């Protein structure tokens, strides 16, 4: 896919799962959605990061997460689209609420 986010936007591949998950530190995340076609639309794997500042800002964002990390973001943020059967979303940096590193053994791309 040749989509590159601009400014402080983040391109994510949506994670599909309809179950509660428990992190290694015991945090329970319920990812079920009322609309099963868009389940877990608030969790995704980072595919690409925008390289510039948002409109009206002079500093580039300092991302604490990178390509390959899993992020959680506001439910109604950004735009959703499909490409070759996969679901993606482009969201603003300020809509990212939390992130986690991939499980050990899975390498993160930079």
From Swiss-Prot:
InterPro entries, alphabetized: Chaperonin_GroES, Chaperonin_GroES_sf, GroES-like_sf
Subunit structure: Heptamer of 7 subunits arranged in a ring. Interacts with the chaperonin GroEL.
Keywords: Chaperone, Cytoplasm
Function: Together with the chaperonin GroEL, plays an essential role in assisting protein folding. The GroEL-GroES system forms a nano-cage that allows encapsulation of the non-native substrate proteins and provides a physical environment optimized to promote and accelerate protein folding. GroES binds to the apical surface of the GroEL ring, thereby capping the opening of the GroEL channel.
GO cellular component: cytoplasm
A single GO BP: chaperone cofactor-dependent protein refolding
NCBIfam families cross-referenced by the UniProt entry: PRK00364.3-2 (NF001536)
High-level lineage: Bacteria, Bacillati, Mycoplasmatota, Mycoplasmoidales, Mycoplasmoidaceae
CDD domains in the cross-refs: cpn10
Recorded name of the encoding gene: groES
Family under the similarity heading: Belongs to the GroES chaperonin family.
GO molecular function, one term: protein folding chaperone
Record's protein name: Co-chaperonin GroES
Compartment(s) of residence: Cytoplasm
Organism: Mycoplasma genitalium (strain ATCC 33530 / DSM 19775 / NCTC 10195 / G37)
SMART domains from the UniProt entry: Cpn10
């Amino acid at each position: 896919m040749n989509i590159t986010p601009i400014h402080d936007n983040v391109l994510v591949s949506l994670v599909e799962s309809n179950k509660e998950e428990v992190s290694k530190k015991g945090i329970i995340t319920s990812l079920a959605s009322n609309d099963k076609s868009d389940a877990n639309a608030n969790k995704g794997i980072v595919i690409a990061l925008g390289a510039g500042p948002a409109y009206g800002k002079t500093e580039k964002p300092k991302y604490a997460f990178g390509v390959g990390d899993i992020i959680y973001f506001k439910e109604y943020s950004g735009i959703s689209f499909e490409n070759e059967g996969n679901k993606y979303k482009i969201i603003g940096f300020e809509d990212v609420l939390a992130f986690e590193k991939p499980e050990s053994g899975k390498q993160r791309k930079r």
